[in-house]
Amino acid sequence: ADNRRPIWVMGHMVNSLAQIDEFVGLGSNSIETDVSFDKQANPEYTYHGIPCDCGRACLHSTKFNDFLKGLRKVTTPGDSKYLEKLILVVFDLKTGSLYDNQAYDAGTKLAKNLLQHYWNNGNNGGRAYIILSIPNLNHYKLITGFKETLKNEGHEELLEKVGTDFSGNDDISDVQKTYNKAGVTGHVWQSDGITNCLLRGLTRVKAAVANRDSGSGIINKVYYWTVDKRQSTRDTLDANVDGIMTNYPDITVEILNEAAYKKKFRIATYEDNPWETFKG
């Protein structure tokens, strides 16, 4: 058996359909997409805006539902646009524009959009796993709204494909408390990181990995962002993360192919369950 750790190579800030092909072509098996909301808490655009990572164009933008339709095509086996390698999508939900009391509505509206335009109302929709990444612990009701909507619409089975992440670099203990409040018991990724324009140590990522490996924490997988340089990629792998978010997936793949890393890590495939803690 192959007992190497599966790695998700997460293409950062993929906000146009052309960029999906570009990043997967460079070696990503996963993408991160920014989602902006209108004043009524409807997901509106895949859009990051200024400022963004150094060396990247910040203004790529697609109507959210058009992005979902294109994403469905590239993750539906048999479609002419199908990309077999793309197995996971992180929606970086820009809920900072919303009031805290709109979080539930945002979750509801997000679920309805995904159900219709990505999952094709449960009829042979896209197959990728989805992570809802939320920047603010106070917005945990987004998860509740999302889950209750899929249940009410008769598609609870799709929750098998959905996980969550709180991306605000909060104390791990506070993240754990928030998940308790939200009634979340699994499918948890934990991110840690900072824009590539700045440096950040691995202290908190190591704390997240320790929680993951303790057997008593809530975290299943840990990813670190944004990792663009060869040495920082090696350091991140040495910390035993599960995912590396990058602007340069070809560099991540290059390091994964170095002898020292090739024996411990491999690129995740669709058969790898992203909600399962790796036991090595």
UniProtKB/Swiss-Prot annotation:
GO CC annotation: extracellular region
Tissue: Expressed by the venom gland.
Top EC class for this record: lyase
Keywords: Antibiotic, Antimicrobial, Cytolysis, Dermonecrotic toxin, Disulfide bond, Hemolysis, Lipid degradation, Lipid metabolism, Lyase, Magnesium, Metal-binding, Secreted, Toxin
Gene3D superfamilies listed in its UniProt record: Phosphatidylinositol (PI) phosphodiesterase
Superkingdom of the organism of origin: Eukaryota
Active site: 12, 48 (nucleophile)
Co-factor(s): Mg(2+)
Catalytic activity, as annotated: an N-(acyl)-sphingosylphosphocholine = an N-(acyl)-sphingosyl-1,3-cyclic phosphate + choline; an N-(acyl)-sphingosylphosphoethanolamine = an N-(acyl)-sphingosyl-1,3-cyclic phosphate + ethanolamine; a 1-acyl-sn-glycero-3-phosphocholine = a 1-acyl-sn-glycero-2,3-cyclic phosphate + choline; a 1-acyl-sn-glycero-3-phosphoethanolamine = a 1-acyl-sn-glycero-2,3-cyclic phosphate + ethanolamine
Cysteines engaged in disulfide bonds, as pairs: 52-58, 54-197
Location(s), subcellular: Secreted
Major localization listed first in the record, in broad terms: secreted
Cofactor comment: Binds 1 Mg(2+) ion per subunit.
Annotated residues for binding of Mg(2+): 32, 34, 92
Gene Ontology BP annotations: defense response to bacterium; killing of cells of another organism; lipid catabolic process
EC annotation from Swiss-Prot or TrEMBL: 4.6.1.-
GO molecular function annotation: lyase activity; metal ion binding; phosphoric diester hydrolase activity; toxin activity
Signal peptide stretch: none
Transmembrane segments: none
Family: Belongs to the arthropod phospholipase D family. Class II subfamily.
Record protein name field: Dermonecrotic toxin LgSicTox-alphaIC1
Species per Swiss-Prot/TrEMBL record: Loxosceles gaucho (Spider)
